[in-house]
Amino acid sequence: MSEKRFPRLTTDIIIQIRGSQEHIVLVKRKFPPEGWAIPGGFVEYGETVEEAAQREAQEETSLQVQLLRQFHVYSDPQRDPRGHTASVVFIASAEGVPVAQDDAAEVQVFHRDHLPSPMAFDHSQILSDYFSGYY
């Protein structure tokens, strides 16, 4: 009998900045898969998804975020080329200037009409859902 496998739990944080839903923080990944991404990462053992979201946001952008609400869960088995993940996506707000840290090679604030490419994972779909008001 084969051993059961389970998806890894991750979190992604859509960080609104400058008091606007039109401006968000994105990171350029330092490691594969390459591209721009919504800040986020794996939930560590003993940590809630909310704690993981706040930790990952700070680790990658240096920003202290205020979580506003849970947005959606994205769990397509093909969403991450490294393996099956399920991501709890949050909407958060922050003040200040983001600074790239940890596994982020670069961090920038983008207006919804000027998003970079390529985007990693399924983050283009997540942002499309967010900006279209898919709640």
Which positions does each model-derived feature cover?
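NUDIX/MutT-family hydrolases
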Residues: V89-I91, V99-S132
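Hydrophobic pocket-lining residues within nucleotide cofactor-binding pockets
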Residues: F31, V43, Y74, A94, ...
